[in-house]
Regions:
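Catalytic acidic motif of RecA-like/P-loop NTPases
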Residues: 104, 129-130
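Conserved D-loop-proximal element of ABC-family nucleotide-binding domains
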Residues: 92, 117-118, 130-138
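Conserved NTPase motor "head" modules and their coupling/switch loops across ABC/AAA+ ATPases, GTPases
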Residues: 1-124, 146
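C-terminal lobe/lid and adjacent interdomain/linker elements of RecA-like ASCE P-loop ATPase modules
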Residues: 79, 135-169
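Generic enzyme active-site microenvironment
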Residues: 124-127, 156
Length: 169
């Protein structure tokens, strides 16, 4: 029984390591694609990064790079998004720095990039127009329209540029 458990832990660790390596490789491409999508929404100076972290654990069952790590059914990586909204700003966790309007536009960028693999069918954007107007609003409106071809998009907006491209009101 002990040998079987050791074998299962070894197999899990091997698969989790492969998964972590794949995530690390894909996260670079994903970061680039999301940055490009953000630039299309007039967030020209923004930097976006997908970071992988592992939480340490007292449990010695699974080790990664010589450290005991917390593990689960999806491996041992924690994924966190980092953002610098403007050139020269330090990159920080998205959850701690973005304003409401920025979060909506970043989410629009993420959802636009991941739309084919995303199981979520309905997206709600609340005041995605906060802090923008003119050309930026036109770009956001077009991105929402493009996304609405794949998903149901519900958008709360005050700008006519965005409202005018909706199929239904």
């Amino acid at each position: 029984m002990r040998n079987k458990l050791k074998d299962l832990i070894s197999r899990y660790t091997s698969i989790a390591n492969e998964l972590s390596q794949s995530r690390a490789e894909l996260s670079k491409n994903l970061s680039t694609q999301i940055e490009m999508a953000m630039k299309r929404l007039n967030m020209d100076g923004a930097t976006f990064k997908v970071e992988l972290h592992q939480k340490t654990s007292q449990d010695e069952t699974v080790r990664h790079n010589g450290v005991n790590v917390k593990y689960g059914p999806k491996g041992f990586d924690d994924v966190e998004f980092y953002l610098s909204a403007n050139p020269g700003e330090a990159i920080k966790p998205l959850s701690k720095i973005a304003s409401g309007g920025e979060v909506s536009r970043i989410m629009l960028s993420i959802k636009s990039v991941l739309k084919e693999g995303d199981p979520v069918e309905t997206l709600i954007f609340d005041e995605i127009d906060s802090g923008i107007s003119g050309e930026a609003a036109d770009k956001v409106a077009k991105a929402l329209k493009a996304l609405s071809k794949e998903k149901q998009v519900i958008c709360i907006t005050h700008l006519p540029q965005i409202a005018s491209l909706a199929d239904n009101h």
